[in-house]
Amino acid sequence: MIGRIAGVLLEKNPPHLLIDCNGVGYEVDVPMSTFYNLPSTGERVVLLTQMIVREDAHLLYGFGTAEERSTFRELLKISGIGARMALAVLSGMSVHELAQTVTMQDAARLTRVPGIGKKTAERLLLELKGKIGADLGAMAGAASASDHASDILNALLALGYSEKEALTAVKNVPAGTGVSEGIKLALKALSKG
């Protein structure tokens, strides 16, 4: 198995990459979330990878984070979901958004990903429940605790608070609280520390 690849980025054509590793060019497909964070061509790149061996091809998929690769692997375990569909899901939403979608059982949000219909979305929600990122799932659970918790959480993260601090503060915000008031309450809770 090839678990990691490091080399010079030669070509970028979404979602395909060509990476030179000591004179050998590896073709790697990446989700758009990884693609947008790549360096310019000619620069060094490091990706975590998942190799898929099929009868007619050996394919390499690359990821910028361990969470993305782990989620990709979980998606592959679901009947009817292949590597292309898993890549489409990760290109259509971040791992955090997917965890939040699964926690809230929001099939409509999943159907916005090209190639995913209602039945596939429902199967994904059922199969992924409790399986993707425990920390991300906890964050998604906290975000669903109040109507605007997701916005409050993002504001705290943007202010430089850690995910753990932000989650703890958001859990103390009563459901139905507006974003502005929720941020004030969360900041107050954080200042009491």
From Swiss-Prot:
Location(s) in or outside the cell: Cytoplasm
Keywords: Cytoplasm, DNA damage, DNA recombination, DNA repair, DNA-binding
InterPro entries associated with the record: DNA_helicase_Holl-junc_RuvA_I, Hlx-hairpin-Hlx_DNA-bd_motif, NA-bd_OB-fold, RuvA, RuvA_2-like, RuvA_C, RuvA_C_sf
Span list, region Flexible linker: 139-143
Family to which the UniProt record says this protein belongs: Belongs to the RuvA family.
Self-association and partners: Homotetramer. Forms an RuvA(8)-RuvB(12)-Holliday junction (HJ) complex. HJ DNA is sandwiched between 2 RuvA tetramers; dsDNA enters through RuvA and exits via RuvB. An RuvB hexamer assembles on each DNA strand where it exits the tetramer. Each RuvB hexamer is contacted by two RuvA subunits (via domain III) on 2 adjacent RuvB subunits; this complex drives branch migration. In the full resolvosome a probable DNA-RuvA(4)-RuvB(12)-RuvC(2) complex forms which resolves the HJ.
UniProt-listed NCBIfam families: ruvA
Domain statement: Has three domains with a flexible linker between the domains II and III and assumes an 'L' shape. Domain III is highly mobile and contacts RuvB.
Designated name of the protein: Holliday junction branch migration complex subunit RuvA
Organism: Paraburkholderia phytofirmans (strain DSM 17436 / LMG 22146 / PsJN)
Lineage of producing organism: Bacteria, Pseudomonadati, Pseudomonadota, Betaproteobacteria, Burkholderiales
This protein's encoding gene: ruvA
